[in-house]
Amino acid sequence: MRSEKSLTLAAPGEVRGPEGEQQDAGDFPEAGGGGGCCSSERLVINISGLRFETQLRTLSLFPDTLLGDPGRRVRFFDPLRNEYFFDRNRPSFDAILYYYQSGGRLRRPVNVPLDIFLEEIRFYQLGDEALAAFREDEGCLPEGGEDEKPLPSQPFQRQVWLLFEYPESSGPARGIAIVSVLVILISIVIFCLETLPQFRVDGRGGNNGGVSRVSPVSRGSQEEEEDEDDSYTFHHGITPGEMGTGGSSSLSTLGGSFFTDPFFLVETLCIVWFTFELLVRFSACPSKPAFFRNIMNIIDLVAIFPYFITLGTELVQQQEQQPASGGGGQNGQQAMSLAILRVIRLVRVFRIFKLSRHSKGLQILGKTLQASMRELGLLIFFLFIGVILFSSAVYFAEADDDDSLFPSIPDAFWWAVVTMTTVGYGDMYPMTVGGKIVGSLCAIAGVLTIALPVPVIVSNFNYFYHRETEQEEQGQYTHVTCGQPAPDLRATDNGLGKPDFPEANRERRPSYLPTPHRAYAEKRMLTEV
């Protein structure tokens, strides 16, 4: 049975036992790193003035943590008070201590913000596994380099990478970002303007020596009906079917008109900038595989490849020789080529997503959708069930009506979708009493179906929005960890002696590092790989 010693404080820097003999702090079992201590021995932990008392065997359950490892926690030991002192967040320590008492259950107190509690977890060194489990319980995305910005090792590549990838890094980088945004906007405007009737290449009335443009003058209904035809008339009224007899002069004329078109020239300048930017960023990126895994870089590739496909198609059409016969086959081949080109050029609209590289709002929206994929999947699944159910119900409810607008269940899918989403397009509607009842139930079910997952999506958006705001605010402050003595404490073989404790001098107080202060730093921490 262990006999407890009654200790009395004497002069600063010395501790006396029951017989009055002088003892060093290294004579205490706990202060000496736990050597020879009983597993049921208790110790006191002082968190910013709030004292906690627990057993050593409770902390020893996790020996790889700050409190569980005697060698790590010993530098916070105060021999004058015979306790450990931490100048940390007090409400968070309730959950930290419960982590040891419960054998690994980590729960954040409701009155502690998430970022503060994450900082406390890292300070007490609970480990990456506990941190990952806690983030998963909190609904956070796993950490994996999202806030860590890798940089190339070469100085020149590092400067180029910062210049084109991080607009906030310098003034020239902001200038390049502004130029990139302007080029993106010009490309989108050109994509929209070239579809106007005043500028659209129509190919009718080709008496001007090439492909004519649509006149802005109003035309009669008969000519408007003819405009809906997909046939094209080229140089001097030559139709696509007559190209075989007309030689390649019409194609040359078309090619010359295509390559001298103002829209094509502006588009070419935009593509030159996009290609230059992509190649520079690829040559300076720190990791080539990670470069192609980035969704933004994939969008950049998708934004420029339709131009080169269209350009290659036009060049091939100019160089190939048309046969003297088989005009019908050429007509069908050209119609197929035009259809493919329309689909390819439609991909140009995805250039608008390039703006998300320079917009925090679009990035937050993308992260919200990524984090809400499960809720969005449930929403689509519920809508699918509702569409099948109510389209079948309205079809059979309207089956006896001769004027029914629902000839089949697949035809009623459209009505069910616009009704459940509360759009109410109005092109299809029930006429019978039973059909109207089904329509009412469909609208109510649609409101409930859409309303259920929306709060989760809004919650994710708020989380990412506040996290982005907090990161911007944290970029303006530098946090200095408090509670660690400034000089390095070195443990002796027999424990901790008086020379190892600066608090055992006449000042009676440890020399702590300064409190958190404001530092006007705008940049985030960038790690070099």
From Swiss-Prot:
One of its GO terms (biological process) is protein homooligomerization. Residues 210-220 have a biased composition (Low complexity). This is Potassium voltage-gated channel subfamily A member 6. The modification Phosphoserine is found at S3, S511. Homotetramer and heterotetramer of potassium channel proteins. Interacts with KCNAB1 and KCNAB2. A motif (Selectivity filter) lies at residues 422-427. The gene is KCNA6. A lipid is attached at C285 (S-palmitoyl cysteine). It is a multi-pass membrane protein. The keyword Transmembrane helix applies. A motif (PDZ-binding) lies at residues 527-529. The lineage of its organism: Eukaryota, Metazoa, Chordata, Craniata, Vertebrata. It is found in: Cell membrane. Residues 410-421, 422-429 dip into the membrane without crossing it. The chain crosses the membrane at residues 172-193, 263-284, 296-316, 338-358, 374-395, 437-465. GO terms for cellular component: axon terminus; cytosol; intracellular membrane-bounded organelle; membrane; plasma membrane; potassium channel complex; voltage-gated potassium channel complex. It catalyses: K(+)(in) = K(+)(out). Changing V447F: Found in a patient with epilepsy but without evidence of neurodevelopmental impairment; uncertain significance; affects channel properties resulting in slower channel deactivation. One of its GO terms (molecular function) is voltage-gated potassium channel activity. The N-terminus may be important in determining the rate of inactivation of the channel while the tail may play a role in modulation of channel activity and/or targeting of the channel to specific subcellular compartments. The transmembrane segment S4 functions as a voltage-sensor and is characterized by a series of positively charged amino acids at every third position. Channel opening and closing is effected by a conformation change that affects the position and orientation of the voltage-sensor paddle formed by S3 and S4 within the membrane. A transmembrane electric field that is positive inside would push the positively charged S4 segment outwards, thereby opening the pore, while a field that is negative inside would pull the S4 segment inwards and close the pore. It comes from Homo sapiens.
